[in-house]
């Protein structure tokens, strides 16, 4: 689950992570009133959407007067902002964050993530702040420093100081930076986050260390422990298909391809998408049906996939362990009939009751193309979509 920058900064502020003062506004008039509450002569007017790259896309403005705050607010509110993370359709700006300006000395990047290789939380930092960390990793990976954190001990003060020295935080600000990082780690752990990222973190002319950005992703599996976090969810910022999928215990992420995928298991889903790409196709989604799919669940999965107008074919790749292939086959047949599917459909089944499942598909009389392996299925759906 994602939240807006201003919500992230409210969490930071409440847990001892230093941020500039700021207020959220929903109209140009409110933006001016909120700016008046700030003790500043310079204001930063920030578009609030669930996507990065806002600055480069024109979604962050520096205002040197209240009249400029009003001008920028009118310019941004209602505008569709297109960044490298929104896709070409962009996102409409419905709220702004009005923040105090500060005398930036230097910008940095810091982030806490879960490293799947070590199964531990990792602190990453770089003195190349203000730019995409992926770009830094690709061009100058030597400028990224990491600290792997022992889950029993947590982030140690010496690790925080070492990172601060490595990214060339001014000596007079190292202790403040270390304290900042320790507080930020506490946010990550206490709120069950999957990512906490600040880009940029800045040092100021006064020697302060501040978060000028706040990106927080929460582990959906832990949200039951954080009702206060759930209340921050902005459904208008989320894909309606993803919201619908979550209602049926389906994991769905929209992509920009044209081949819909329904798979059970996240690992198999990713392997399926990679295989489709290998044979020249483009997946339209990640959809994990989980290990307990029912006929109804399969039908809903088809409806969600077909809710994407770009989909030109569907590949179902199921390994029946807990999930029985005959149940999946019955669900596929029922779904195809209910949604009146006219697009190419390739189904690969393997595992428990696989022969019975294949017989159900064959006897249905529907235009369902079988596949014996994942590779064969991927090749078939790519070919059918290209010929359609």
Swiss-Prot record:
Binding site for Mg(2+): 199, 213
Cofactors required: Mg(2+)
GO annotation terms (biological process): succinyl-CoA metabolic process; tricarboxylic acid cycle
First-level EC class: ligase
Keyword Ribosomal protein: no
Cited PANTHER family: SUCCINATE--COA LIGASE [GDP-FORMING] SUBUNIT BETA, MITOCHONDRIAL, SUCCINYL-COA SYNTHETASE BETA CHAIN
Known role: Succinyl-CoA synthetase functions in the citric acid cycle (TCA), coupling the hydrolysis of succinyl-CoA to the synthesis of either ATP or GTP and thus represents the only step of substrate-level phosphorylation in the TCA. The beta subunit provides nucleotide specificity of the enzyme and binds the substrate succinate, while the binding sites for coenzyme A and phosphate are found in the alpha subunit.
Protein name: Succinate--CoA ligase [ADP-forming] subunit beta
Species in which this protein is naturally found: Staphylococcus aureus (strain NCTC 8325 / PS 47)
Gene: sucC
């Amino acid at each position: 689950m994602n939240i807006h920058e201003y919500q992230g900064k409210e969490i930071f502020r409440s847990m001892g992570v230093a941020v500039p003062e700021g207020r959220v506004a929903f109209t140009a008039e409110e933006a001016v009133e909120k700016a008046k509450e700030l003790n500043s002569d310079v204001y930063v007017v920030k578009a609030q959407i669930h996507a990065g790259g806002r600055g480069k896309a024109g979604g962050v403005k520096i205002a040197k007067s209240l009249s400029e705050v009003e001008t920028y607010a009118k310019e941004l509110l209602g505008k569709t902002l297109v960044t490298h993370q929104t896709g070409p359709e962009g996102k409409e700006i419905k709220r702004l964050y009005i923040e105090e300006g500060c005398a930036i000395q230097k910008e940095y990047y810091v982030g806490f993530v879960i490293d799947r290789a070590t199964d531990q939380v990792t602190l990453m930092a770089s003195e190349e702040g203000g730019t995409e960390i992926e770009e830094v990793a690709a061009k100058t990976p030597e400028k990224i420093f990491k600290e792997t954190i022992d889950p029993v001990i947590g982030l140690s003060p010496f690790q925080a100081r070492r990172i601060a020295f490595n990214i060339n935080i001014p000596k007079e600000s190292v202790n403040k930076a270390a304290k900042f990082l320790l507080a930020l780690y506490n946010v990550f752990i206490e709120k069950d986050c999957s990512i906490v990222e600040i880009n940029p973190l800045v040092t100021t002319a006064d020697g302060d260390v501040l978060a000028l950005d706040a990106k927080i992703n929460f582990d959906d599996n832990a949200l039951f422990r954080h009702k206060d976090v759930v209340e921050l969810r902005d459904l208008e910022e989320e894909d309606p298909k993803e919201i619908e999928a979550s209602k049926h215990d389906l994991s769905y992420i929209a992509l920009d391809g044209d081949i819909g995928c329904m798979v059970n298991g996240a690992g198999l889903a990713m392997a399926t998408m990679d295989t489709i790409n290998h044979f020249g196709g483009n997946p339209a989604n990640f959809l994990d049906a989980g290990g307990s799919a029912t006929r109804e669940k399969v039908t809903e999965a088809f409806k969600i996939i077909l809710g994407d107008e770009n989909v030109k074919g569907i590949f179902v790749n199921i390994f029946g362990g807990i999930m029985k292939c005959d149940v999946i086959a019955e669900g596929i047949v029922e779904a195809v009939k209910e949604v009146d599917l006219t697009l190419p459909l390739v189904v690969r089944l393997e595992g428990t009751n696989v022969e019975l499942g294949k017989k159900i598909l064959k006897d249905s009389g529907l235009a369902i193309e079988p596949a014996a392996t994942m590779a064969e299925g991927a090749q078939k759906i790519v070919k059918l979509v290209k010929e359609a």
